[in-house]
Protein backbone atom coordinates (compact mmCIF):
# COMPACT_ATOMS: atom_id res chain seq x y z
CA UNK A 1 0.00 0.00 0.00
CA UNK A 2 1.37 3.39 -1.03
CA UNK A 3 0.60 6.71 0.62
CA UNK A 4 -0.57 9.06 -2.13
CA UNK A 5 -1.39 12.77 -1.95
CA UNK A 6 -3.53 14.14 -4.79
CA UNK A 7 -3.73 17.91 -5.26
CA UNK A 8 -6.70 19.72 -6.78
CA UNK A 9 -8.34 23.13 -6.85
CA UNK A 10 -12.01 22.32 -6.13
CA UNK A 11 -14.47 19.58 -7.02
CA UNK A 12 -16.67 21.81 -9.16
CA UNK A 13 -18.16 20.18 -12.25
CA UNK A 14 -15.54 19.94 -15.00
CA UNK A 15 -13.77 17.37 -17.12
CA UNK A 16 -10.57 17.48 -15.07
CA UNK A 17 -12.49 17.05 -11.82
CA UNK A 18 -14.56 14.17 -13.23
CA UNK A 19 -11.33 12.46 -14.28
CA UNK A 20 -9.82 13.09 -10.84
CA UNK A 21 -12.82 11.50 -9.11
CA UNK A 22 -12.45 8.46 -11.37
CA UNK A 23 -8.72 8.26 -10.62
CA UNK A 24 -9.39 8.40 -6.88
CA UNK A 25 -11.85 5.53 -7.23
CA UNK A 26 -9.26 3.53 -9.15
CA UNK A 27 -6.60 4.14 -6.49
CA UNK A 28 -9.00 3.06 -3.73
CA UNK A 29 -9.77 -0.13 -5.65
CA UNK A 30 -6.03 -0.81 -5.68
CA UNK A 31 -6.05 -0.46 -1.86
CA UNK A 32 -3.87 2.64 -1.83
CA UNK A 33 -3.91 5.09 1.10
CA UNK A 34 -5.15 8.27 -0.59
CA UNK A 35 -5.49 11.86 0.61
CA UNK A 36 -7.06 14.60 -1.52
CA UNK A 37 -5.88 18.12 -0.69
CA UNK A 38 -7.90 20.94 -2.29
CA UNK A 39 -7.34 24.67 -2.45
CA UNK A 40 -11.02 24.91 -1.54
CA UNK A 41 -13.09 21.98 -0.30
CA UNK A 42 -16.24 22.59 -2.31
CA UNK A 43 -18.08 21.43 -5.42
CA UNK A 44 -20.85 19.09 -6.53
CA UNK A 45 -18.36 16.33 -7.33
CA UNK A 46 -17.33 15.91 -3.70
CA UNK A 47 -20.07 13.29 -3.46
CA UNK A 48 -18.29 11.17 -6.09
CA UNK A 49 -15.14 10.86 -3.98
CA UNK A 50 -14.87 7.42 -2.35
CA UNK A 51 -15.41 7.47 1.40
CA UNK A 52 -12.00 5.83 1.86
CA UNK A 53 -10.28 9.02 0.64
CA UNK A 54 -9.39 11.64 3.25
CA UNK A 55 -10.42 15.03 1.84
CA UNK A 56 -8.85 18.18 3.27
CA UNK A 57 -8.39 21.84 2.38
CA UNK A 58 -5.16 23.85 2.33
CA UNK A 59 -4.63 25.93 5.45
CA UNK A 60 -3.80 29.58 4.93
CA UNK A 61 -2.00 30.95 7.97
CA UNK A 62 -1.50 34.56 6.85
CA UNK A 63 -3.91 37.26 5.78
CA UNK A 64 -3.60 39.35 2.64
CA UNK A 65 -2.30 42.86 2.23
CA UNK A 66 -4.29 45.23 4.52
CA UNK A 67 -5.41 47.37 1.57
CA UNK A 68 -7.01 44.35 -0.09
CA UNK A 69 -8.57 43.27 3.21
CA UNK A 70 -10.24 46.68 3.56
CA UNK A 71 -11.73 46.27 0.08
CA UNK A 72 -13.24 42.81 0.57
CA UNK A 73 -13.91 42.96 4.32
CA UNK A 74 -12.56 40.96 7.24
CA UNK A 75 -13.28 37.23 7.24
CA UNK A 76 -12.01 34.33 9.34
CA UNK A 77 -13.11 31.01 7.81
CA UNK A 78 -10.52 28.82 6.03
CA UNK A 79 -12.34 29.11 2.71
CA UNK A 80 -12.40 32.89 2.98
CA UNK A 81 -8.70 32.99 3.86
CA UNK A 82 -8.18 30.89 0.74
CA UNK A 83 -10.12 33.51 -1.22
CA UNK A 84 -7.92 36.20 0.30
CA UNK A 85 -4.77 34.45 -0.81
CA UNK A 86 -6.02 34.17 -4.38
CA UNK A 87 -7.09 37.80 -4.32
CA UNK A 88 -3.67 38.80 -3.06
CA UNK A 89 -2.20 36.76 -5.89
CA UNK A 90 -4.14 38.63 -8.55
CA UNK A 91 -3.26 41.95 -6.91
CA UNK A 92 0.45 41.18 -6.75
CA UNK A 93 0.50 39.74 -10.26
CA UNK A 94 -0.92 42.89 -11.80
CA UNK A 95 0.73 45.55 -9.65
CA UNK A 96 4.03 44.16 -8.40
CA UNK A 97 5.07 41.30 -10.65
CA UNK A 98 3.79 40.61 -14.14
CA UNK A 99 3.83 37.76 -16.59
CA UNK A 100 7.58 37.13 -16.64
CA UNK A 101 7.83 36.88 -12.85
CA UNK A 102 4.73 34.82 -12.07
CA UNK A 103 6.90 32.20 -10.36
CA UNK A 104 7.97 34.83 -7.84
CA UNK A 105 4.32 35.58 -7.19
CA UNK A 106 3.63 31.94 -6.34
CA UNK A 107 6.66 31.94 -4.06
CA UNK A 108 5.12 34.83 -2.15
CA UNK A 109 1.78 33.04 -1.90
CA UNK A 110 3.55 29.88 -0.68
CA UNK A 111 4.61 31.90 2.36
CA UNK A 112 0.93 32.18 3.32
CA UNK A 113 0.04 28.49 3.28
CA UNK A 114 0.98 25.76 5.72
CA UNK A 115 3.09 22.91 4.30
CA UNK A 116 1.90 19.33 4.10
CA UNK A 117 4.01 17.73 6.83
CA UNK A 118 3.19 14.06 6.20
CA UNK A 119 5.64 11.93 4.26
CA UNK A 120 4.10 10.38 1.13
CA UNK A 121 5.24 7.85 -1.40
CA UNK A 122 3.65 9.79 -4.27
CA UNK A 123 2.34 13.31 -4.82
CA UNK A 124 0.09 13.92 -7.82
CA UNK A 125 -0.61 17.48 -8.90
CA UNK A 126 -3.58 16.35 -10.93
CA UNK A 127 -5.05 19.77 -11.66
CA UNK A 128 -2.08 21.37 -13.41
CA UNK A 129 -3.20 24.21 -15.75
CA UNK A 130 -0.60 26.57 -14.29
CA UNK A 131 -2.45 26.58 -10.99
CA UNK A 132 -1.04 27.18 -7.53
CA UNK A 133 -1.28 23.44 -6.84
CA UNK A 134 1.84 22.90 -8.99
CA UNK A 135 3.88 25.31 -6.87
CA UNK A 136 2.49 23.79 -3.67
CA UNK A 137 3.30 20.24 -4.76
CA UNK A 138 6.84 21.20 -5.71
CA UNK A 139 7.75 23.17 -2.58
CA UNK A 140 5.32 22.31 0.23
CA UNK A 141 5.06 18.50 0.10
CA UNK A 142 7.39 15.60 0.92
CA UNK A 143 7.36 12.47 -1.23
CA UNK A 144 9.65 9.92 -2.85
CA UNK A 145 8.21 10.76 -6.27
CA UNK A 146 6.10 13.60 -7.64
CA UNK A 147 4.03 13.82 -10.83
CA UNK A 148 2.22 16.69 -12.54
CA UNK A 149 -0.58 16.43 -15.12
CA UNK A 150 -0.99 18.41 -18.34
CA UNK A 151 -4.60 18.37 -19.54
CA UNK A 152 -4.54 20.63 -22.60
CA UNK A 153 -2.50 21.26 -25.73
CA UNK A 154 -2.86 25.04 -25.44
CA UNK A 155 -0.10 25.88 -22.93
CA UNK A 156 -0.67 29.63 -22.69
CA UNK A 157 -0.59 29.34 -18.89
CA UNK A 158 2.84 27.72 -18.72
CA UNK A 159 4.60 30.92 -17.63
CA UNK A 160 2.88 30.58 -14.25
CA UNK A 161 4.57 27.34 -13.18
CA UNK A 162 7.56 26.77 -15.46
CA UNK A 163 9.91 27.38 -12.48
CA UNK A 164 8.28 24.52 -10.55
CA UNK A 165 7.70 21.85 -13.21
CA UNK A 166 11.35 20.64 -13.28
CA UNK A 167 10.93 19.62 -9.63
CA UNK A 168 8.51 16.84 -10.66
CA UNK A 169 9.75 13.35 -11.50
CA UNK A 170 7.00 12.62 -14.03
CA UNK A 171 5.00 14.79 -16.41
CA UNK A 172 1.82 13.01 -17.45
CA UNK A 173 0.10 14.28 -20.59
CA UNK A 174 -3.47 13.24 -21.34
CA UNK A 175 -2.85 12.85 -25.08
CA UNK A 176 -0.05 12.65 -27.64
CA UNK A 177 -0.70 16.20 -28.97
CA UNK A 178 -0.29 17.48 -25.40
CA UNK A 179 2.96 15.52 -24.97
CA UNK A 180 4.40 17.03 -28.15
CA UNK A 181 3.58 20.53 -26.96
CA UNK A 182 5.16 19.91 -23.55
CA UNK A 183 8.36 18.52 -25.06
CA UNK A 184 8.56 21.51 -27.40
CA UNK A 185 8.56 23.76 -24.31
CA UNK A 186 10.69 21.50 -22.09
CA UNK A 187 12.99 19.45 -24.38
CA UNK A 188 15.30 18.81 -21.43
CA UNK A 189 12.43 17.01 -19.64
CA UNK A 190 11.46 14.73 -22.54
CA UNK A 191 12.58 11.60 -20.70
CA UNK A 192 10.17 12.39 -17.83
CA UNK A 193 7.20 13.04 -20.11
CA UNK A 194 4.70 10.40 -21.18
CA UNK A 195 1.07 9.97 -22.21
CA UNK A 196 -1.36 8.73 -19.57
CA UNK A 197 -5.00 8.92 -20.57
CA UNK A 198 -7.44 10.19 -17.99
CA UNK A 199 -9.25 7.23 -16.50
CA UNK A 200 -13.00 7.28 -17.11
CA UNK A 201 -15.30 4.72 -15.51
CA UNK A 202 -17.38 3.85 -18.57
CA UNK A 203 -19.74 1.56 -16.66
CA UNK A 204 -20.47 4.35 -14.20
CA UNK A 205 -21.23 6.76 -17.06
CA UNK A 206 -23.65 4.23 -18.51
CA UNK A 207 -25.29 3.64 -15.12
CA UNK A 208 -25.67 7.36 -14.50
CA UNK A 209 -27.22 7.82 -17.93
CA UNK A 210 -30.13 5.64 -16.76
CA UNK A 211 -31.08 8.04 -13.97
CA UNK A 212 -34.42 9.83 -14.50
CA UNK A 213 -34.26 13.11 -16.38
CA UNK A 214 -36.80 15.74 -15.41
CA UNK A 215 -35.84 19.16 -16.75
CA UNK A 216 -38.57 21.39 -18.21
CA UNK A 217 -35.94 23.32 -20.18
CA UNK A 218 -34.67 20.23 -21.99
CA UNK A 219 -37.35 19.84 -24.63
CA UNK A 220 -37.69 19.72 -28.40
CA UNK A 221 -37.97 17.19 -31.21
CA UNK A 222 -34.38 17.75 -32.41
CA UNK A 223 -31.89 18.25 -29.59
CA UNK A 224 -28.17 19.03 -29.91
CA UNK A 225 -25.99 18.93 -26.79
CA UNK A 226 -22.57 20.14 -25.68
CA UNK A 227 -21.07 19.70 -22.19
CA UNK A 228 -18.17 21.76 -20.88
CA UNK A 229 -17.13 24.94 -19.11
CA UNK A 230 -18.16 28.21 -20.70
CA UNK A 231 -14.71 29.45 -21.65
CA UNK A 232 -12.96 30.64 -24.80
CA UNK A 233 -11.31 27.34 -25.68
CA UNK A 234 -14.68 25.55 -25.91
CA UNK A 235 -15.77 27.62 -28.91
CA UNK A 236 -19.26 28.46 -27.66
CA UNK A 237 -19.13 31.85 -29.37
CA UNK A 238 -18.77 29.91 -32.63
CA UNK A 239 -21.71 27.73 -31.51
CA UNK A 240 -23.91 30.82 -31.24
CA UNK A 241 -22.99 31.81 -34.80
CA UNK A 242 -23.59 28.26 -36.09
CA UNK A 243 -27.00 28.34 -34.41
CA UNK A 244 -27.85 31.61 -36.15
CA UNK A 245 -26.82 30.17 -39.52
CA UNK A 246 -28.90 27.01 -39.06
CA UNK A 247 -31.90 29.07 -37.98
CA UNK A 248 -31.52 31.21 -41.10
CA UNK A 249 -31.59 28.02 -43.18
CA UNK A 250 -34.92 27.05 -41.61
CA UNK A 251 -33.78 24.16 -39.39
CA UNK A 252 -35.99 23.63 -36.32
CA UNK A 253 -33.81 22.52 -33.38
CA UNK A 254 -32.52 23.37 -29.93
CA UNK A 255 -28.85 23.35 -28.95
CA UNK A 256 -28.34 22.86 -25.21
CA UNK A 257 -25.07 23.64 -23.47
CA UNK A 258 -24.34 22.31 -19.98
CA UNK A 259 -21.64 23.95 -17.89
CA UNK A 260 -20.78 26.97 -15.79
CA UNK A 261 -17.88 29.26 -16.48
CA UNK A 262 -16.57 32.78 -16.66
CA UNK A 263 -18.08 33.42 -20.12
CA UNK A 264 -21.61 32.19 -19.39
CA UNK A 265 -23.34 35.57 -19.08
CA UNK A 266 -21.44 36.98 -22.03
CA UNK A 267 -22.57 34.04 -24.17
CA UNK A 268 -26.21 34.44 -23.13
CA UNK A 269 -25.98 38.09 -24.13
CA UNK A 270 -24.42 37.10 -27.44
CA UNK A 271 -27.28 34.67 -28.10
CA UNK A 272 -29.78 37.51 -27.61
CA UNK A 273 -27.81 39.76 -29.95
CA UNK A 274 -27.98 37.05 -32.63
CA UNK A 275 -31.68 36.51 -31.80
CA UNK A 276 -31.16 32.79 -31.11
CA UNK A 277 -31.82 32.68 -27.35
CA UNK A 278 -34.69 30.24 -28.01
CA UNK A 279 -32.48 27.98 -30.13
CA UNK A 280 -29.23 27.85 -28.12
CA UNK A 281 -29.91 27.40 -24.42
CA UNK A 282 -27.20 27.67 -21.79
CA UNK A 283 -28.46 25.44 -18.99
CA UNK A 284 -25.61 26.14 -16.60
CA UNK A 285 -24.26 23.41 -14.36
CA UNK A 286 -25.98 20.03 -14.11
CA UNK A 287 -24.64 17.55 -11.56
CA UNK A 288 -25.24 14.57 -13.85
CA UNK A 289 -25.08 15.38 -17.58
CA UNK A 290 -25.20 11.70 -18.63
CA UNK A 291 -29.03 11.45 -19.05
CA UNK A 292 -28.91 14.59 -21.20
CA UNK A 293 -26.24 13.02 -23.39
CA UNK A 294 -28.20 9.80 -23.68
CA UNK A 295 -31.33 11.59 -24.91
CA UNK A 296 -29.76 14.04 -27.38
CA UNK A 297 -29.89 13.56 -31.16
CA UNK A 298 -26.42 14.92 -31.91
CA UNK A 299 -23.51 15.59 -29.59
CA UNK A 300 -21.57 18.66 -30.80
CA UNK A 301 -18.13 19.82 -29.64
CA UNK A 302 -16.88 22.99 -31.40
CA UNK A 303 -13.71 23.34 -29.29
CA UNK A 304 -10.72 25.46 -30.21
CA UNK A 305 -8.39 23.48 -27.92
CA UNK A 306 -8.65 20.30 -25.85
CA UNK A 307 -6.39 17.81 -24.11
CA UNK A 308 -8.21 14.50 -24.18
CA UNK A 309 -11.87 15.55 -24.06
CA UNK A 310 -13.69 13.40 -21.53
CA UNK A 311 -17.09 14.51 -22.78
CA UNK A 312 -16.29 12.91 -26.14
CA UNK A 313 -15.40 9.65 -24.37
CA UNK A 314 -18.68 9.75 -22.47
CA UNK A 315 -20.70 10.48 -25.61
CA UNK A 316 -18.94 7.60 -27.41
CA UNK A 317 -19.72 5.26 -24.52
CA UNK A 318 -23.42 6.12 -24.94
CA UNK A 319 -23.23 5.55 -28.73
CA UNK A 320 -24.11 9.14 -29.62
CA UNK A 321 -23.43 10.58 -33.05
CA UNK A 322 -20.70 13.19 -32.53
CA UNK A 323 -19.67 16.16 -34.64
CA UNK A 324 -16.48 17.75 -33.31
CA UNK A 325 -13.97 20.34 -34.42
CA UNK A 326 -11.07 18.91 -36.40
CA UNK A 327 -8.23 19.48 -33.93
CA UNK A 328 -5.42 17.07 -32.93
CA UNK A 329 -6.97 15.90 -29.65
CA UNK A 330 -10.28 15.05 -31.35
CA UNK A 331 -8.47 12.99 -34.00
CA UNK A 332 -7.21 10.70 -31.25
CA UNK A 333 -10.81 9.59 -30.65
CA UNK A 334 -12.85 10.37 -33.76
CA UNK A 335 -12.28 8.96 -37.24
CA UNK A 336 -14.33 11.12 -39.59
CA UNK A 337 -17.25 9.23 -41.09
CA UNK A 338 -16.44 6.04 -39.19
CA UNK A 339 -17.17 6.49 -35.47
CA UNK A 340 -18.17 10.15 -35.64
CA UNK A 341 -17.57 13.28 -37.66
CA UNK A 342 -14.86 15.95 -37.71
CA UNK A 343 -15.24 19.41 -39.16
CA UNK A 344 -13.08 22.55 -39.42
CA UNK A 345 -14.10 25.13 -36.84
CA UNK A 346 -15.79 27.39 -39.35
CA UNK A 347 -19.38 28.57 -39.01
CA UNK A 348 -20.52 27.71 -42.54
CA UNK A 349 -18.68 24.37 -42.72
CA UNK A 350 -19.95 23.29 -39.30
CA UNK A 351 -23.52 24.18 -40.24
CA UNK A 352 -23.11 22.28 -43.52
CA UNK A 353 -21.79 19.23 -41.66
CA UNK A 354 -24.72 19.22 -39.22
CA UNK A 355 -27.24 19.34 -42.06
CA UNK A 356 -25.38 16.67 -44.03
CA UNK A 357 -25.27 14.31 -41.04
CA UNK A 358 -28.95 14.87 -40.24
CA UNK A 359 -29.87 14.02 -43.84
CA UNK A 360 -27.85 10.77 -43.79
CA UNK A 361 -29.78 8.27 -41.65
CA UNK A 362 -27.76 5.35 -43.02
CA UNK A 363 -24.49 7.06 -42.11
CA UNK A 364 -25.67 7.80 -38.57
CA UNK A 365 -26.75 4.19 -38.11
CA UNK A 366 -23.32 3.01 -39.28
CA UNK A 367 -21.59 5.33 -36.79
CA UNK A 368 -23.73 4.04 -33.92
CA UNK A 369 -22.99 0.44 -34.92
CA UNK A 370 -19.25 1.19 -34.91
CA UNK A 371 -19.51 2.83 -31.49
CA UNK A 372 -21.28 -0.24 -30.08
CA UNK A 373 -18.50 -2.47 -31.38
CA UNK A 374 -15.35 -0.52 -30.51
CA UNK A 375 -13.85 -0.92 -27.02
CA UNK A 376 -13.06 2.04 -24.78
CA UNK A 377 -10.31 0.79 -22.46
CA UNK A 378 -8.22 2.91 -20.08
CA UNK A 379 -6.87 0.11 -17.92
CA UNK A 380 -3.37 -0.24 -19.40
CA UNK A 381 -1.84 2.85 -17.80
CA UNK A 382 -3.37 2.13 -14.39
CA UNK A 383 -2.33 -1.48 -13.92
Where would I find each of the regions flagged by the language model?
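A conserved mid-protein helix/loop that constitutes part of the nucleotide-sugar donor-binding site
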Residues: 17-22, 222-245, 251, 262-268
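Short acidic/histidine- and often glycine-rich active-site loop of Leloir-type glycosyltransferases
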Residues: 314, 327-337, 341-342
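Conserved acidic donor-binding segment of nucleotide-sugar-dependent glycosyltransferases
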Residues: 336-337, 341-348, 356-361
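Carbohydrate-associated surface elements
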Residues: 177, 199
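Short hydrophobic beta-strand element within catalytic cores of glycosyltransferases
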Residues: 321-324
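Nucleotide-activated donor-binding/catalytic signature segment of Leloir-type glycosyltransferases, i.e.
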Residues: 268-284
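Aromatic "clamp/platform" in nucleotide-sugar-dependent glycosyltransferases that forms part
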Residues: 285, 304
Amino acid sequence: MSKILVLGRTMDMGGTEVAMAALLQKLVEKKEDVTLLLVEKRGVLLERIPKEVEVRQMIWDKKPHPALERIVGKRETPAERSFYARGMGVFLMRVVYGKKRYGKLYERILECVEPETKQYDLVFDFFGFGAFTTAFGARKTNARKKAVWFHGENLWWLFRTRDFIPEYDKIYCVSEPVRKQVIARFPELADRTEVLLNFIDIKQVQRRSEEPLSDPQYTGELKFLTVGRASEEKGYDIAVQITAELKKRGLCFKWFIIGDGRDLNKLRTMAKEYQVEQEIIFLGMRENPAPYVKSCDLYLQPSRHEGYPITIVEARSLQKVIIASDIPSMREQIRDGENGYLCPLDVMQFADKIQKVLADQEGRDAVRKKLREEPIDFSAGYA
